[in-house]
Amino acid sequence: MPARIVCLSPYSKKQVEDLLTGRHAVEVVTVPDPPAPEAVLRECTLAELVIGDKRHAHRLPREVLQHMTRCLLIQMPAVGYDVIDDRAAAEFGIAVANAAGYNRDAVADWTVMAMLNLIRRGSWGDRRLREGGWPKAEMMGRELGALTVGIVGLGNVGLALATRLLAFGSRVLYADVVERSFAGVERVSFGDLLELADVVCVHVPLSGETHHLIDAEALARMREGAYLINASRGPVVDEKALVAALESRHLGGAGLDVFEQEPTPMDNPLRRMENVFFSPHVGGATLEAEARVLEVVRDNLTRVLDGDEPSNVVNGVRLGARLRSFTPSPRPSPAHAGEGDR
């Protein structure tokens, strides 16, 4: 039988089929929008391979995973995988893999853009000019090279960001549970980073430990007039506490690509604040990053189809015997395709 692949991301059936041109026959199924938990359960129950939803609309909780007895791998076409109960997946022997690092340059670029926008009041000035103003006196800014920037989480994105900041001449600090060896970057405690940095950039995965990592207490420790940039996950920052810190002018501004609820509600006070730079969770959205993530998806699905362990597994599962008993049908050769129609 062909291997059944269920795609929960907004890729077409043909896009997925075109990725997998190897020696194994595959059956690709896509799940329609809007999100329908019953459709996800129905299709994923019969799947050997699942492409997770990069939009975070279709979720895979324990209640669905426990029925996915045929599934070997859930491949996220993203870095984050919080739409999947990865611990439950491990209990059921399902490997969960992500696309670590595929968008590091895109997100690092976005973060620098947000910083420059805030410290030079770029979007604010653009709006004033469009309204007929000429706010020259109000647009005195700062140079990025004169600032101390703190990076919370020096992973793939954090390292790419540090490289860019060093080129600007910034002093770069980082706080991470893991010590990294990177010339020109200084490791400090999380608390010291908050107190020393003119700009705090958050680049950590969402977990129980990082939920509301940036809370009222953390914001209060930041320097008067400092800026907060979040391009990781919305719930890493307590939005109510952030609103209070911005309204009180304790913070100079914030750059946000992610929110606690997405899309963020129209009545979110952040929407009306002049000192906030927004984008709708598109920090990693570039043509180059999209090409790379499709390569990661292709390579990992192909590895499993070929009988090899997947890479970038985030929940510690090795497929072992399950993989050895997985025998997808070979792809029909062109010479035999359509013979039944003769």
Map each language-model feature to its residues.
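N-terminal glycine-/charge-rich "phosphate-binding" loop or analogous flexible N-terminal tail
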Residues: 1-55, 169-173, 322, 326
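Phosphate/diphosphate ligand-binding glycine-rich loop within oxidoreductases
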Residues: 48-126
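Rossmann-like adenosine-cofactor binding region
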Residues: 58-60, 171, 177-269
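Phosphate-binding beta-alpha-beta segment of Rossmann-like dinucleotide-binding domains, i.e.
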Residues: 92-94, 99-148, 160-163, 167, ...
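Rossmann-like dinucleotide-binding domain for NAD(H)/NADP(H)
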Residues: 96, 225-328
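Conserved N-terminal Rossmann-fold NAD(P)-binding element of oxidoreductases
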Residues: 151-152
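Hydrophobic/small residue at the entry helix of a nucleotide-binding pocket
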Residues: 157
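A cross-taxon signal for low-complexity, glycine/charged-rich
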Residues: 330, 337-341
